[in-house]
């Protein structure tokens, strides 16, 4: 019954695909975070490898541009001793009109074991998961505006690392929430892990109308949104996904919602500042904050390797 309700889980409730944080039980999120904690030390070894995925083939399919996500997935799979194949979409048959499912079918014929997929269309990883063989696993590396589950998980790992638990935290998510798959994944993860107050902060034009239904507090001024916050997650303006005049200008946005050291004083003294990247300095966040003592943006990237190792190791170890 669990498998029918959630295509990410097998009949025993074990994770076989990671498509979205939404709908996953707290126990699975905790399992991933705990497993990631064990992998963090691998990054500090002289030989940065474990044999967990030896003999497995991992295909990275990035239909959208990426630096951090693609690179950390490649590093994670390599450190698990997998064979990693990065498909060059621009030079593949997909650029000649081959359908997504035909691409997957052909790669599956090459004995793929795991697909890491980033796609501009929401739901694309779900479609792939429905059409792969039972022994093949799918990880969503970002689909449209829908979800970015491994970013959400590495954000949770970062928060837990610095704040220990979620039970008394106030977390503010600031910026272009409307177009952000990261915001949605973070919100689902935070609520599942028991964070008592999640605030969504941004101009009305960049906050979805139904956001309050997700159990968050909507704030339309930065000052209200970050006052007393323990964690501030800044989001970039996704101009490539915008249509119409949602903002007067990036300069006006920075004036109202850009995080500066002066505004950061409104948060708790030990607040941490996060950002999923890429960062637009001087648009959503000032360079002094990015490079300041409360920024944990680079540790997020480091933790992302361990989290993605954990996800790949867990899904590859479970059968449909």
Curated annotation (Swiss-Prot):
It catalyses: carbamoyl phosphate + L-aspartate = N-carbamoyl-L-aspartate + phosphate + H(+). Carbamoyl phosphate binds at residues 68-69, 118, 148, 151, 277-278. GO terms for biological process: 'de novo' pyrimidine nucleobase biosynthetic process; 'de novo' UMP biosynthetic process; amino acid metabolic process. InterPro entries: Asp/Orn_carbamoyltranf_P-bd (IPR006132), Asp/Orn_carbamoylTrfase (IPR006130), Asp/Orn_carbamoylTrfase_sf (IPR036901), Asp_carbamoyltransf (IPR002082), Asp_carbamoyltransf_Asp/Orn-bd (IPR006131). GO terms for molecular function: amino acid binding; aspartate carbamoyltransferase activity. Keywords: Pyrimidine biosynthesis, Transferase. Pathway: Pyrimidine metabolism; UMP biosynthesis via de novo pathway; (S)-dihydroorotate from bicarbonate: step 2/3. It comes from the Bacteria. L-aspartate binds at residues 96, 181, 236. Catalyzes the condensation of carbamoyl phosphate and aspartate to form carbamoyl aspartate and inorganic phosphate, the committed step in the de novo pyrimidine nucleotide biosynthesis pathway. PANTHER family: ASPARTATE CARBAMOYLTRANSFERASE, ORNITHINE CARBAMOYLTRANSFERASE, MITOCHONDRIAL. Belongs to the aspartate/ornithine carbamoyltransferase superfamily. ATCase family. This is Aspartate carbamoyltransferase catalytic subunit. It comes from Polaromonas sp. (strain JS666 / ATCC BAA-500).
């Amino acid at each position: 019954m669990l498998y029918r309700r959630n295509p990410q889980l097998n009949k025993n409730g074990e994770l076989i695909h990671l498509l979205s944080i939404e709908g996953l039980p707290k126990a699975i999120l905790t399992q991933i975070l705990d497993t990631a904690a064990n992998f963090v030390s691998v990054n500090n070894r002289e030989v940065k490898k474990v044999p967990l995925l030896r003999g497995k083939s991992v295909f990275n399919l990035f239909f959208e541009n990426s630096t951090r996500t693609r690179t950390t997935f490649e590093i994670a799979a390599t450190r698990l001793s997998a064979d990693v194949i990065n498909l060059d979409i621009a030079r593949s048959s997909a650029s000649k009109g081959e359908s997504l499912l035909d691409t997957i079918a052909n790669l599956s014929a090459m004995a793929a074991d795991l697909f890491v997929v980033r796609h501009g269309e929401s739901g694309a990883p779900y479609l792939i998961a429905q059409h792969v063989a039972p022994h093949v696993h799918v990880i969503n590396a970002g689909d449209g505006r829908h979800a970015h589950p491994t970013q959400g998980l590495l954000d949770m790992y970062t928060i837990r690392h610095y704040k220990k638990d979620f039970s008394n935290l106030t977390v503010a998510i600031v910026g272009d929430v409307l177009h952000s798959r990261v915001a949605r994944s973070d919100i689902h993860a935070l609520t599942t892990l028991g964070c008592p107050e999640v605030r969504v902060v941004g101009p009305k034009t960049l906050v979805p109308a139904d956001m309050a239904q997700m159990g968050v507090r909507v704030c339309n001024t930065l000052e209200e949104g970050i006052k007393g916050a323990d964690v501030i997650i800044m989001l970039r303006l996704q101009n490539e996904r915008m249509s119409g005049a949602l903002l007067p200008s990036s300069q006006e946005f920075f004036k109202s919602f850009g995080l500066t050291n002066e505004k950061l004083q409104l948060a708790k003294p030990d607040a941490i500042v996060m950002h999923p990247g890429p960062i637009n300095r001087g648009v959503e966040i000032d360079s002094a904050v990015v490079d300041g003592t409360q920024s944990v943006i680079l540790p997020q990237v480091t933790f992302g390797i361990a989290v993605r190792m954990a996800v790949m190791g867990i899904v590859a170890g479970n059968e449909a």
